[in-house]
Amino acid sequence: MVYYDIHTHHLPVHPEDVAIVNSLVPTFDVETGLFRSVGIHPWYIYNVEEQLAELKRQVSFPDVVAIGETGLDKGAEAPLDCQREIFRASASLAENAGVFLMIHCVKAWDELIASKKELKPRVPWIIHGFRGNATLAGQLIRQGFYLSFGEYFNPGAVREAWPGRLFAETDDREIDIRTVYRNLSVSLNLRLEQFAGQVAENVRDI
């Protein structure tokens, strides 16, 4: 049975597990042999032109399968207009490269949904570390988003995302992806093997 960690800042605990390791541009300048996502986090915007140039360079690396984290965060120091510029550019790069978008969103759900309606992406948009309630989860799924869940989650939201819109992650937490799988499968009253099989199918779909 293969476990997929769709978003992490750590190397996998078990070498046989599949992980997409997040890299903050431009701090990761070498190919690693692992799957990677590269992105400009809304907390760490300091030079838009320079960071976007580096993002464009790195997205061409063969180990890069996603752009992110990127997104909108009303608690971040960077102005929302600046965040929007980065986000739109990141979404465009993801479209051109044919890789999925890993999204960080805090208190900007209306703006995020509006962006998706406007940009009409063909590649998957995945909201990482989703902790919102079932109502918000259902709204996002109806708009075509995928949700990724980690150590903390709302069971009702997990049920909304199951089966075809759900992923699992460890993010920056000191937790094994296998524990996340177990917790999510228990919340759905499913056998671990059934849960893992569906997540594997979801990964193949993106």
Identify the meaning behind each predicted range:
Residues M1-I206:
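Mid-domain alpha/beta scaffold segments of enzyme catalytic cores
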